[in-house]
């Protein structure tokens, strides 16, 4: 594997091509710790009460976790246990790593859901006709550049972080710690509105490590054990640039290095900067919060259109008002990659999908405790989730 290591090299970019970059963060990143704790709490409630109404936020800093939010549920939850188990799973199990699930302080500031919201959204209403939990706009995106119908930039960034966790847990690289960040720049060619990845232009990897390992050993291992295992060789060439541990030292990480907060990695969670984002975070929210459920449904719509051969690339927008069940608007943008007009695609979507929250929850089975798995390595592009299974469209 050739390429430029930790040096600036501006490769010539041919006419008709462009560069695009996406980033991902590992399970031990402080913001991602918060997201995973939120969804661990949500799952704990859904295991006992599938109709629980959960809006949970988390703050993390050295030796401390704060849970805040509004929850109405019949479940009896040991929040101390749920939070500590989530942190243990991530890998912060000793104070030498800067955080320890056994000794951290867990503060709980949870209240009931506002009765004003409850009466406007779901009380005394059939499940199919429950209203949206808030106003907002959500997007779904899909592209035919990968089998997952996800951008290659974010697919590779997530896979690099997931592989780092695997190498840490199986002992291959024992100096690894849970906090990590990756970033991938890909050179693309445009093809009548669709995009085709040509090569990987730049890879950035920063990973928390122990005191003993030397920089050269880390850089060599990241190239040989990580990048070669994850990035297909056809995308790497002598001009690929590598910034591996560019800061030189990353011993202090996780909540000790930076405060963590729910919902600060919404682009990592979705499409890596492609498409669009309505601004709402996912983790810690039950299905009545359309920030989450409608974004999942919009992805389902987008992937179904691409996998159905109706377009090569598509962006779907939906919007809602609090207490209103039907979406206020549905919009389709196909980037010129469809033989059908955007109006025709919109009619196909309306005839095949019911985007009321109470129907989305049924079609995508969103009352099941599946959410902790979504909270790291992206909510989209993994076949184990119902919204990633394309619907066979009738038109």
From Swiss-Prot:
Phosphoserine: residues bearing it: 114, 384
Residues that bind ATP: 29, 179-181, 247-250, 258, 264-265, 281, 285, 291
Catalytic activity: L-methionine + ATP + H2O = S-adenosyl-L-methionine + phosphate + diphosphate
Keyword Phosphoprotein: yes
Summary of the tissues where the protein is detected: In mammalian tissues, there are three distinct forms of AdoMet synthases designated as alpha, beta, and gamma. Alpha and beta are expressed only in adult liver, while gamma is widely distributed in extrahepatic tissues. In addition, the gamma form predominantly exists in fetal rat liver and is progressively replaced by the alpha and beta forms during development. In the brain, highly expressed at night in pinealocytes (at protein level).
Sorted UniProt keywords: Acetylation, ATP-binding, Isopeptide bond, Magnesium, Metal-binding, Nucleotide-binding, One-carbon metabolism, Phosphoprotein, Potassium, Transferase, Ubl conjugation
InterPro entries with a match to the protein in the record: ADOMET_SYNTHASE_CS (IPR022631), S-AdoMet_synt_C (IPR022630), S-AdoMet_synt_central (IPR022629), S-AdoMet_synt_N (IPR022628), S-AdoMet_synthetase (IPR002133), S-AdoMet_synthetase_sfam (IPR022636)
Residues where Mg(2+) binds: 31
Enzyme class: transferase
GO cellular component annotations of the record: cytosol; methionine adenosyltransferase complex
GO MF terms held by the record: amino acid binding; ATP binding; identical protein binding; metal ion binding; methionine adenosyltransferase activity; small molecule binding
Position of the Glycyl lysine isopeptide (Lys-Gly) (interchain with G-Cter in SUMO2) cross-link: 228, 234
UniProt KW Acetylation keyword: yes
Cofactor(s) in the UniProt record: Mg(2+); K(+)
CDD domains to which the protein is assigned, alphabetical: S-AdoMet_synt
Domain of life: Eukaryota
GO biological process: cellular response to leukemia inhibitory factor; cellular response to methionine; circadian rhythm; one-carbon metabolic process; positive regulation of TORC1 signaling; protein heterooligomerization; protein hexamerization; response to cAMP
Ligand binding (L-methionine): 70, 113, 258, 289
Induction notes from the record: Exhibits night/day variations with a 5-fold increased expression at night in the pineal gland (at protein level). Up-regulation is due to a large degree to the release of norepinephrine from nerve terminals in the pineal gland and cAMP signaling pathway.
EC number: 2.5.1.6
Cofactor note as given: Binds 2 magnesium ions per subunit. The magnesium ions interact primarily with the substrate.
Binding site for K(+): 57
Self-association state and partner proteins as the record states: Heterotrimer; composed of a catalytic MAT2A homodimer that binds one regulatory MAT2B chain. Heterohexamer; composed of a central, catalytic MAT2A homotetramer flanked on either side by a regulatory MAT2B chain.
Protein purpose: Catalyzes the formation of S-adenosylmethionine from methionine and ATP. The reaction comprises two steps that are both catalyzed by the same enzyme: formation of S-adenosylmethionine (AdoMet) and triphosphate, and subsequent hydrolysis of the triphosphate.
Protein name: S-adenosylmethionine synthase isoform type-2
Organism, scientific name: Rattus norvegicus
Gene name, Swiss-Prot/TrEMBL: Mat2a
